[in-house]
A protein has these predicted regions:
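Conserved ABC transporter NBD signature motif
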Residues: 60-72, 77-79
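Conserved ABC ATPase signature
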Residues: 143-147, 151
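Catalytic Walker B motif of ABC-type/P-loop ATPase nucleotide-binding domains
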Residues: 168-172
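H-loop/switch region of ABC-family ATPase nucleotide-binding domains
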Residues: 204-205
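Helix-to-loop junction immediately C-terminal to a conserved catalytic motif
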Residues: 52
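Conserved ABC ATPase "signature" region
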Residues: 105, 120-139
Length: 254
């Protein structure tokens, strides 16, 4: 078995005066989709932000592709570029007349490396290939401000694809999509995981989707309550620990 893409070891992160995440340890293997589930306020977004180096950690270790995150949350540039992040909300000024192909092209440019072919044929090919992989090539000349929610999510996946990646992190990225668009989004994720060997770490409130689509699940409520396959982890006992017994009764009644 190959080495895990992400290793989190005894991680504790504080929000002001309280431990929002306490003594959490897990790994994210290559080619697998790992979901983080738990109630509001459980520390899911805090955990993601610590992994990304946005929030400082009180204690513990984080390794990406074998490289340790520094105490200041930094990784070597060549490792940092192996991580793609899709937030729940993508905010931009809709008055900016940027097209889909221009936005995806920024994913190629954003390191600021001046290569001989930057802006040339290799860049155009990478943008076209990324849009093709997410079935969005037909949108390339469309303004980003004119995209539907489902179209925008596909374009943002293309932005992540335009350079090689090893780890994709999503903070409820499908939130706000209709059922059809959400299903298409997860179909694309499954395809990319299979074809690219991506390790995926995502926050989700949709337990049915987690059961259908994810390989592993982490049940979080400040501490890690359980981890494993969805069938082994999303039991009534574990869900009651994470969410409370009222949630479990309601969820099973639906």
């Amino acid at each position: 078995m190959s080495d895990p893409v992400l290793v989190v070891n005894e991680l504790t992160v504080y929000r002001e005066t309280y431990a929002a995440v306490q003594n959490v340890s897990f790994t994210v293997p290559a080619g697998m989709d790992t979901a983080i589930v738990g109630p509001n306020g459980a520390g899911k977004s805090t955990l993601i932000q610590a992994i990304l180096g946005i929030l400082p950690r009180r204690s513990g270790e984080i390794f990406v592709l074998g490289q340790a995150l520094s105490p200041k949350g930094r990784l070597p540039a060549e490792i940092r570029e192996q991580i793609a992040y899709l937030p729940q909300n993508f905010l931009f000024d809709r008055r900016i007349p940027i097209t889909v192909k221009e936005l995806v092209g920024l994913g190629w440019d954003r390191l600021g490396i001046q290569l001989p072919w930057t802006g040339g044929r290799a860049r155009r090919h990478a943008v076209q290939q990324a849009l093709t992989q997410v079935d969005a090539l037909h949108l390339r000349h469309k303004l980003v401000s004119a995209l539907s929610g489902g179209e925008l999510k596909r374009v943002l996946l293309a932005y992540c694809l335009v350079r090689p990646r090893r780890l994709l992190i999503l903070d409820e990225a499908p939130a706000g999509l209709d059922v059809r668009s959400e299903s298409e989004f997860y179909r694309l994720l499954h395809q990319l995981k299979k074809e690219q060997g991506w390790a995926i770490l995502q926050i989700s409130h949709d337990l049915d989707m987690v059961r259908r689509s994810c390989d592993r699940v982490l049940c979080l409520n400040r501490t890690l309550l359980c981890q494993g396959t969805p069938d082994n982890s999303l039991t009534p006992e574990n869900l009651s620990l994470a969410y409370g017994s009222e949630f479990v009764r309601y969820h099973h009644a639906c």
